[in-house]
């Protein structure tokens, strides 16, 4: 079962549940080949990974793993930040990793030293936090059963809620300028005006078929 995929250069990084993090060579899109698989401990579920330069940050049911993927055929574990009940996704900005933990809120981890990640702060969301995006000092958190919460994270030790968009099934989101695009597994795609962070406004929606749980915009 594949939970999520991210692409960097000629390689795709796939969170493959309890099969680990699979790194796939897609230099020839017609013939993708498995370059390697990283599995820390048998049974640990890998959900999502973000790759920056030669480092991969993987969200798992055992917390955050930081890997050296300079050689995609032989990933090497550098560090691990354990988290009870794990993390659903990971979002790294500068030297901070943000980890939505479903019903256990959001963890913020300093990853300046990949071999020694250090937890900086924590915010308990009122609902299941699945996905988030960070722009400057603002975090947008998709809370699956209640909507999107907007946080001021200028002080990482004490994030503060500044706005909320109520909706059912906010599974993922993407920020583009003053617009936020939200994928909802029940309601399709929603476009939200976030020019006023304290009062986000739904401006458009597309109720297509299927079960959208992720989104990318450009």
Enumerate the language-model features and the residues they cover.
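Feature marking well-ordered beta-strand scaffolds used for ligand recognition
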Residues: 1-218
């Amino acid at each position: 079962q594949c939970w999520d995929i991210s692409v960097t250069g000629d390689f795709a990084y796939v969170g493959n549940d309890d099969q680990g993090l699979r790194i796939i060579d897609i230099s020839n899109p017609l013939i993708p080949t498995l370059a390697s698989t990283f599995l820390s401990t048998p049974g640990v579920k890998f959900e999502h990974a973000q790759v920056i330069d030669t480092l991969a940050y993987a969200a798992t049911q055992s917390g955050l793993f930081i890997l050296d993927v300079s050689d995609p055929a032989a990933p090497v574990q550098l560090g691990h930040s354990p988290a009870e009940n794990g993390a659903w996704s990971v979002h790294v900005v500068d030297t901070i990793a943000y980890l939505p933990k479903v019903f256990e809120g959001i963890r913020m981890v300093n990853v300046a030293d990949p071999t020694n990640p250090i937890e900086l702060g924590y915010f308990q969301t009122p609902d299941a936090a699945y996905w988030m995006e960070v722009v400057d000092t603002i975090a947008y958190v998709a809370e699956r059963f209640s909507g999107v919460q907007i946080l001021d994270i200028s002080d990482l030790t004490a994030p503060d809620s500044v706005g909320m968009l109520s909706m059912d099934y906010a599974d993922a989101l993407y920020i583009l300028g003053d617009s936020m695009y939200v994928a909802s597994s029940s309601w399709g795609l929603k476009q939200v005006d976030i020019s006023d962070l304290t009062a986000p406004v739904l401006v458009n929606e597309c109720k297509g078929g299927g079960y959208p749980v992720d989104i990318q915009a450009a």
